[in-house]
Design a protein with these regions (language model features):
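N-terminal helix-turn-helix
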Residues: 35-68
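HTH-adjacent hinge/linker in prokaryotic transcriptional regulators
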Residues: 58, 62-90
């Protein structure tokens, strides 16, 4: 997944991230069921606040483009995974 933020954009960071992920899902660059990086990992990669990524993911989830799965890691700690929605064969 490739996300590029534009410093001169009038759109907030979360909107830029949401729009780019949405575009990649719709043009099939991101495949159905493909895992997305955690909000923390993507925020670190883009050097932005994790809340910006969480908001973008929340909005994508509300649009039905991604799904959120909760589970536990191998140590039993809670873990949340985000994936491109399976039903997203548009």
């Amino acid at each position: 997944m490739n996300i590029e933020l534009k410093d001169l954009s009038h759109n907030p960071v979360y909107a830029q991230v949401r729009e780019q992920i949405e575009s990649q899902i719709k043009n099939k660059t991101l495949a159905s069921g493909e895992p997305l990086p955690s909000p923390a990992a993507l925020a670190q990669k883009l050097s932005v606040d994790k809340g910006e990524i969480q908001r973008a993911y929340f909005e994508l989830e509300q649009l039905g483009l991604i799904t959120k799965h909760t589970g536990k890691d191998f140590l039993g700690k809670p873990r949340i995974d985000y994936r491109v929605a399976i039903s997203n064969a548009r």
